[in-house]
Amino acid sequence: MLDRCDRVQVAVIDRHKAAEGYRRIFGAETAREDSSRHLGAKRLILALGESEIELCEPDGAGRVGDHLAKWGESLMTAGYSTVDVAALERRLDQLGVTTAREGEQLYFGPPHTPGVPFVISPSTYRPRVGRASFLYETTNTLVSDWRTAAAIYSGLFGLDPSRFSKIGSHRFAYEGTLTLFDPPNRLDRIELSQVTGPDSAMGRFTARRGDSLYMAYVEVHDWPGVHAALMDSKSRWTPRGKDAATERDGGWVHPKELGGLLLGVSRTTVAWEWSGRKHLVAAPR
């Protein structure tokens, strides 16, 4: 029932300051500003490619303030879209999942998910803004068995396990699967990464938080522009290869640059290399 990974919500101290990195690196632009009683927040919503980044600054007591008090500035909510939010709400209700509605958005999360809070929005067309194309992934880091998590998400969202693609990394010490929604047409998925090494970055993260929401991924159609912005501004990031100056495929932007969001970046099609369809990867321009 899920269509796309269309947004993330990030808990920040100052929404306008947090927006600076997205503008500088990706050419993101303000889509709108509003407030959320459900979150207890003022929101600055950025257009990032076809997707949106909700920068949530506390506005009195509420979920955003609680998140900041416990974890500091960081990724708070994984956002996906569906063509029929009401139908998904009915499905979740039948499964005994506690949900909350605010406007067009549907919220739910633990204990019904393996540590990830979700916000579901209606699928809609948006023009691309800036150097990014779209978000396509949020990462659920796990101490528990990734197979159990995959079964949970399949049940909640009606996903087809035959479309999933198994993953693993010695470099980052995890194993798991990508719950691809519509391959090979789109990359959208939830990544399930079960930690295999306690000394890895994911291992240290899950030691503090357990099963949890870790990061997001964006595809960019203008990697040279993103790369130049990263290098020229001396932003903190890690290249996918060995040399930042000559990196051609992407990397990871440090949370300090993006108001607490660890954001993976990949040039057009390169993510298919680890998504089960290497033949779809086009050479860099």
Regions found by a protein language model. Give the residues of each.
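An N-terminus-focused feature that recognizes amino-terminal "leader" regions
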Residues: 1-62
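Serine-centered coil/turn micro-motif
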Residues: 61-65, 199-200, 270-272
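Aromatic-anchored, glycine/proline-accented short structural segments
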Residues: 146-196
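N-terminal beta-strand motif that seeds the catalytic metal site of vicinal oxygen chelate
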Residues: 1-19, 73-80, 121-157, 162, ...
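N-terminal strand-loop-strand beta-hairpin
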Residues: 30-48, 107-112, 166-181
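Vicinal oxygen chelate
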Residues: 4-13, 44-49, 54, 64-145, 173-194, ...
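Amphipathic alpha-helical segments
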Residues: 14-29, 88-95, 145-161, 226-234
